[in-house]
Amino acid sequence: MSQARPATLRVAVLGAGSWGTALAAAASRRHPTVLWARDGAQAQAMAARHENTRYLPGVALPPALQVSADLAQALAHLAHDPAHALIILGVPVAGMTPLCTELAARLPALGLQAVPLVWTCKGFEEQTARLPHETVQAALGAMPGLAAGVLSGPSFAREVAQGLPVALTVASESSAVRDAVTTALHGAAVRIYASTDVVGVEVGGALKNVIAVACGICDGLALGTNARAALITRGLAEMARFGAALGAQQETFAGLTGLGDLVLTATGELSRNRRVGLEIGAGRKLADILASGMTAEGVRCARAARDRARALNIELPITEAVCAVLFEGLSPMTAVSALLAREARPESPTP
């Protein structure tokens, strides 16, 4: 049994986007928490207004939440009691390498190298096709005492920031990480489940974004709820196949970070990935959608997921179809027809 952690932790959330802000708000309701924003003007405005007007407009943040644009100050908050601290990385996949590289230089100097650390991003790094844990390992793996994991699950940041109920999974081989996240966030509105399957949790979080784009395209084409249900179910099969090839536990894909996150992202009105798909299905070009300011991790990581799957000889027909529509000029309806024309086969592989 893991050792119980104290009732109070010092928490630093690095990254003041919507998700980082939401988690910082949740943690600050029970623990001394600092939210680091790279943009000084944003940090100053958030501290003055107790609101992230850029990413979560209209959501009041707890008065106890501290906001700083000084990374050294945010980390110094932990250095007062490093044995009872937690670092949450709230940056997207694209921001992981630069932030982890900076932490590799700063944490040991402050005696924080063994502080439990979790990341919250979902996706594959575009240039390398790495999952987040591989990025963390590359940047921080040589740091003595590293205890790291991933926090994920079906969640929209706005609802979490508002204090509405949510269930999340923390996955790590380190009991210290699992315990720290549970202590920091588990409470009246947040339920935390623990796992050791980092790869499974990450694969689910990455591929569900791509499948959600496909579901949005389906809805944009007005193909009906039957078609969307088929995409969700067969998309889950793609996630499980990919995960199996990387050593993930299959039961993970039936849980919060697999089926749960997929259903939410593929059907929720707040899903950016689904919204991009809706626009594509309605006939808009990807370049125009992105130029309007709409972003989605499913677009960013689709090619990386496809390329890594090809290298591993994993069949991902829905992911391949999404890439063909987004990047190769294939019409959405032609992609649907190609998926429907695939050879009939058993739903589950024969043992």
Curated annotation (Swiss-Prot):
Organism domain of life: Bacteria
Kindly list the positions annotated as binding sn-glycerol 3-phosphate.
122, 153, 155, 208, 261, 271-273
Which SUPFAM superfamilies does its entry note? 6-phosphogluconate dehydrogenase C-terminal domain-like, NAD(P)-binding Rossmann-fold domains
Q: Where is the protein localized?
A: Cytoplasm
Q: Which UniProt keywords apply?
A: Cytoplasm, Lipid biosynthesis, Lipid metabolism, NAD, NADP, Nucleotide-binding, Oxidoreductase, Phospholipid biosynthesis, Phospholipid metabolism
- What InterPro entries has UniProt attached to this entry? 6-PGluconate_DH-like_C_sf (IPR008927), 6PGD_dom2 (IPR013328), G3P_DH_NAD-dep (IPR006168), G3P_DH_NAD-dep_C (IPR006109), G3P_DH_NAD-dep_N (IPR011128), NAD(P)-bd_dom_sf (IPR036291)
Its cellular-component GO annotations read: cytosol
Q: Which positions are catalytic residues?
A: 208 (proton acceptor)
Named from the GO MF annotations, one term is:
glycerol-3-phosphate dehydrogenase [NAD(P)+] activity
**Residues that, per the record, bind NADPH:** 18-19, 38, 122, 157, 272, 297
What PROSITE patterns does its record include?
NAD_G3PDH
One of the GO BP terms on file: carbohydrate metabolic process
Whether Transport counts among this entry's keywords is no
Q: Which reaction does it catalyse?
A: sn-glycerol 3-phosphate + NAD(+) = dihydroxyacetone phosphate + NADH + H(+); sn-glycerol 3-phosphate + NADP(+) = dihydroxyacetone phosphate + NADPH + H(+)
Q: Which EC number(s) does the record attach to this protein?
A: 1.1.1.94
* Pfam families, sorted: NAD_Gly3P_dh_C, NAD_Gly3P_dh_N
Q: What does this protein do?
A: Catalyzes the reduction of the glycolytic intermediate dihydroxyacetone phosphate (DHAP) to sn-glycerol 3-phosphate (G3P), the key precursor for phospholipid synthesis.
Family from the record: Belongs to the NAD-dependent glycerol-3-phosphate dehydrogenase family.
Q: What's the protein name?
A: Glycerol-3-phosphate dehydrogenase [NAD(P)+]
Question: What species does this protein belong to?
Answer: Bordetella bronchiseptica (strain ATCC BAA-588 / NCTC 13252 / RB50) (Alcaligenes bronchisepticus)
User: Could you tell me the gene encoding this protein?
Assistant: gpsA
